């Protein structure tokens, strides 16, 4: 998230989609988020200290695709997502529906869950930069279809567990469509 200096966390009501053990939830709280709704399809994974924090609402056993405003309560200012085994394209409508019109979205694009099994290399790694680029474009275009344009793209400095190169997208309503030159630059300076 530090790649996107325009994303303000302090005092914001945040949603951590795919919270798991709470990596993003912890980052948000350390940056003084007002509240974090931690959502995961699993159960009991969120670190105990985060689970006990009064600034955190835990929604375990919750499929992001079925998330509603009633479930999260007050609308969300900042959405972060780090999802596995599901394409972001499938959850964008639900994430957009529970957020405020001026909300920011910082999504981790994991090409291994976007390109389809038939395009994965050995060990589930997407090695072809063209496939990684196509994955980011597909997510950004799906976001644009629900009204979210792209303000920033950054390669994650840490590869995924199997060695996959992953990317962050910064999205907001009213922002332009994806800038392919910005994407090419993120791919060029990111891990290969």
Please annotate each region the language model reported.
Residues 3-10, 72-73:
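Glycine-rich helix-loop-beta junction characteristic of Rossmann-like nucleotide cofactor-binding loops
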Residues 9-20:
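Conserved class I S-adenosyl-L-methionine
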Residues 22-23, 44:
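Glycine-rich SAM-binding Motif I of class I
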Residues 27-35:
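Conserved S-adenosyl-L-methionine
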Residues 35-90:
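S-adenosyl-L-methionine
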Residues 89-106:
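A short glycine-rich, Lys/Arg-flanked "PGG" loop and its adjoining helix->strand segment in the class I
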Residues 111-128:
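Short, glycine-/aromatic-enriched active-site segment of Class I SAM-dependent methyltransferases
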Residues 165, 169-192:
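Flexible, glycine-/basic-rich loop-and-beta segments that form/coincide
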């Amino acid at each position: 998230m530090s790649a996107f200096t325009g994303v303000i966390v302090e005092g914001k009501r945040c949603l951590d989609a795919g919270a798991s053990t709470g990596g993003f939830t912890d980052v948000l709280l350390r940056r003084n988020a007002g509240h974090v709704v931690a959502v995961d399809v699993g159960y009991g994974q969120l670190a105990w200290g985060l689970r006990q924090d009064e600034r955190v609402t835990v929604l375990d056993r919750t499929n992001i695709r079925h998330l509603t405003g009633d479930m999260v309560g007050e609308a969300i200012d900042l959405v972060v997502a780090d999802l596995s085994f599901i394409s972001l394209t499938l959850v964008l409508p639900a994430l957009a529906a529970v957020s405020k019109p001026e909300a920011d979205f910082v999504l981790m694009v994991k090409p291994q869950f976007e390109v389809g099994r038939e395009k994965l290399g050995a060990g589930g790694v997407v090695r072809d930069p063209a496939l990684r680029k196509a994955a980011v474009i597909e997510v950004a275009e799906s976001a644009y279809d629900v009204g979210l344009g792209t303000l920033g793209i950054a390669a994650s400095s840490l590869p995924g567990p199997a060695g996959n190169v992953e990317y962050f997208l910064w999205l907001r309503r009213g922002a332009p469509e994806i800038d392919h030159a910005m994407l090419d630059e993120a791919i060029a300076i990111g891990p290969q």
